[in-house]
Amino acid sequence: MTDDDHPQPWTVETWEDGNGRSPFGKWYLKLHEYDQAIVDATIEHVLQPLGMDICETEWGKSLGEGLYELRIRASLNAILNRGISGEEQVSVPGGDKTVLLRIFCTFHGQRIVLLFQGYDKGKDASDKRQQSEIKRARKHLKTWKKEK
């Protein structure tokens, strides 16, 4: 087996503005513990292994101009058992609750994903809220591009 058979996972970083503030970190810390576990599991089991290829699956969507949306609409157990069959599957107590979360990010270089922010689409699925969040993410992306 060669290294090509097991590509290195993508490195995931959280973007901070010039003042050291992280919109993603601020949002993440406000999440319920279960939702934080889902975000962590999605980053580890979906985003890191797939990188940009999330857009070839239900997990990702390109929003244009280098902005991407990581789409989480699954339960913790479903994420943890992704690609696992039968007796090897795990079951976390209470881990069957499905959530609807969005995380905005960009990809840079071969192996870096920058997380800009997120929101709970399950709490407010309105088009107005979604467009507002996308607009804010585009602003963060523009700022990051100027900084790099």
Model-derived regions, located:
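Basic, Lys/Arg-enriched alpha-helical interface segments
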Residues: 1-99, 120-148
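Short, surface-exposed beta-strand/loop micro-motifs that present aromatic residues
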Residues: 101-106
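Active-site beta-strand-loop-beta-strand hairpin of nuclease catalytic cores
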Residues: 107-115
